[in-house]
Curated annotation (Swiss-Prot):
Repressor of the yfmOP operon. A mutation in yfmP leads to overexpression of yfmO, probably causing a decrease in cellular copper that is eventually responsible for a reduced copper induction of copZA. Induction: YfmP is autoregulated. There is no induction with copper or other metals. Binds a DNA inverted repeat of the yfmPO operon. The gene is yfmP. Residues 1-73 form the HTH merR-type domain. InterPro entries: DNA-bd_dom_put_sf, MerR-type_HTH_dom, MerR_fam, YfmP_HTH. CDD domains: HTH_YfmP. SUPFAM superfamilies: Putative DNA-binding domain (SSF46955). GO terms for molecular function: DNA binding; DNA-binding transcription factor activity. This is HTH-type transcriptional regulator YfmP. SMART domains: HTH_MERR. GO terms for biological process: negative regulation of DNA-templated transcription. The keyword DNA-binding applies.
Length: 140
């Protein structure tokens, strides 16, 4: 397995080293392996997890708190999926599927709330644009 130091991860992700350390500190990404000297070593899996955080933040426009919550539910979803795949008991598999469904509903609720916020902001901007257009017309 090939390991990357934080400089390489920062360059590849487009984030600063400080941001990567902060994401680790607040639990957005798992703590990487460390050398005996304390140097962080990141695997390709760590990089993929960081890329998930970045894309979720960029696409959904979540605050750090919302992002933490969303990523935690994503991790819970993965655990439930693993539990479902490992179980042979139909009752247990059904319970895992219900937990997966509940987690997905929660994530969809978070996204719906963000969409409502964007829609409200868009409506305010459209109102301001309309006022500006009317003001221009009244001057002409």
């Amino acid at each position: 397995m090939e390991w990357m130091k934080i400089d390489q991860v920062a360059k590849r992700s487009g984030l600063t080293k400080r941001t990567i350390r902060f994401y680790e500190e607040i639990g957005l990404i798992p703590a990487p392996k460390r050398t005996d000297g304390g140097v962080r070593l990141y695997s390709e899996d760590d990089m993929e997890e960081l890329e998930k955080v970045i894309s979720t933040k960029e696409v959904l426009g979540f605050s750090l708190q919302e992002l933490q919550h969303f990523m935690e539910t994503s991790r819970q979803l993965e655990l439930n999926k693993e539990g479902y795949l490992l179980s042979l008991d139909p009752k247990e598999r059904k319970e895992k599927l219900e937990e997966i469904q509940e987690t997905l509903n929660h994530q969809l609720d978070l996204i719906d709330e963000k969409i409502r916020t964007f829609q409200s902001f868009k409506e305010r901007l459209q109102g301001m644009k309309g006022k500006a257009e009317r003001a221009i017309q009244s001057i002409e």
